Amino acid sequence: MRKIIILPFAEQDIRDSAIHYAEKEEGLEKQFLAILNQAFLLISANPLSFPLVKIPIRKFVIKNFPFNLYYIIEDDIIYILAVFHNKRDPQVWKTRKLR
């Protein structure tokens, strides 16, 4: 399993989404975060299994919530670029850089 580093803008995506779901329905943010944790485990175990959307960025489709997770593999580390709602403008996450 590879190490995962969640970059600051992806951390903000997660926080914003968790707050949204907490306001929408009690306990929904916990479900969202649990599914994200499962996604991180799957990506960590099989990072090359998920499709490239733009070299070197890969996409993981999150089940039960309308989100995609975008990441880059560099050496033995997986960097999470975005946890992005499907209806948001993809140009936002496409401008994100690893460094």
Predicted segments with their positions:
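Basic, Lys/Arg-enriched alpha-helical interface segments
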Residues: 1-57, 99
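Active-site phosphate/pyrophosphate-handling residues
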Residues: 5, 66-68
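Conserved catalytic core of Hanks-type protein kinase domains
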Residues: 42-43, 63, 72, 83
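Short acidic-hydrophobic surface loop/beta-edge motif
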Residues: 58-62
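Enriched for short, Lys/Arg-rich terminal
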Residues: 68, 72-99
